[in-house]
A protein has these predicted regions:
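Short, charged, amphipathic alpha-helical segments
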Residues: 87-98, 118-129, 151-162
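Extracytoplasmic/periplasmic helical hairpin
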Residues: 70-93, 115
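Alpha-helical segments in soluble extracytoplasmic regions
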Residues: 82-110
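Amphipathic alpha-helical segments and their boundaries
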Residues: 17-70, 89-90, 111-131, 183-193
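N-terminal sensory and localization modules of signal-transduction and trafficking proteins
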Residues: 1-10
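Juxtamembrane amphipathic/coiled-coil helical coupling segments that flank
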Residues: 38-53, 71-78, 104-112, 137-201
Length: 205
């Protein structure tokens, strides 16, 4: 009878040990899975940060800076009477047009490759259309300036053409704000997952 009791007790201990071992195994697998998923999420968000949101924001900032310089050069052209200075302004404007076109192409490629970035496509297209309209008016402004019709050129720059430029900058600002939110979210997600991995390492240790 005593032997039977001992056998039953041993079986209970073995059962408890097996349950414990299974629990440890399941918990270990769970922690490994959490760490793996977190690592993948970190990698995905780092790619978004380095390949989408950061370069897109950089391009938007460059566009804002270059278009502002473009407008400054137009004003400089209006107030100058020296032919050499006016020619220099025209050359700078042409150079800026080329740089703006290149930066715009880079931004378009980034947006086309990312589904979230494509949500800003409508604002981007409106901004592009506004810029093309403004750029087309630039030729007329410079022509009037060359003909010593500065008053007409200034009226054009501060009137309808300015409204077009303002519409362009407003859409760029909307895009920049949207992309900044996405960048901040990607950084937050990467940081949270990093903390999770740290907790998993501590728990596993």
């Amino acid at each position: 009878m005593e032997k039977i009791k001992k056998c039953i007790a041993n079986l209970k201990v073995e059962g408890k040990l097996k349950v414990y071992q299974m629990t440890v195994l399941v918990m270990t697998l769970f922690l490994v899975l959490v760490a793996l998923i977190s690592t993948l999420v970190i990698r995905s968000n780092i790619e978004k940060i380095t390949e989408v949101w950061s370069p897109a924001l950089e391009d938007l900032q460059e566009l804002e800076t270059m278009t502002a310089k473009y407008r400054i050069k137009q004003y400089q052209h209006l107030v100058e009477s020296d032919d050499a200075v006016m020619t220099s302004c025209e050359e700078e404007i042409q150079k800026l047009e080329s740089q703006i076109q290149d930066t715009d192409a880079k931004l378009e490629a980034i947006m086309s490759a990312n589904s979230k970035a494509q949500k800003g496509q409508d604002d981007y297209e409106v901004a592009n259309a506004a810029w093309e309209k403004y750029r087309a008016a630039s030729d007329e402004i410079l022509k009037l300036s060359r003909e010593n019709k500065q008053q007409e050129a200034a009226k054009l720059m501060t009137g309808e053409v300015y409204e077009v430029y303002k519409a362009f900058t407003e859409k760029l600002t909307i895009l920049r704000d949207e992309f900044q939110v996405e960048l901040d979210q990607a950084k937050t997600m990467a940081n949270v997952c990093t903390i999770i991995i740290f907790v998993v390492i501590v728990a596993a240790g």
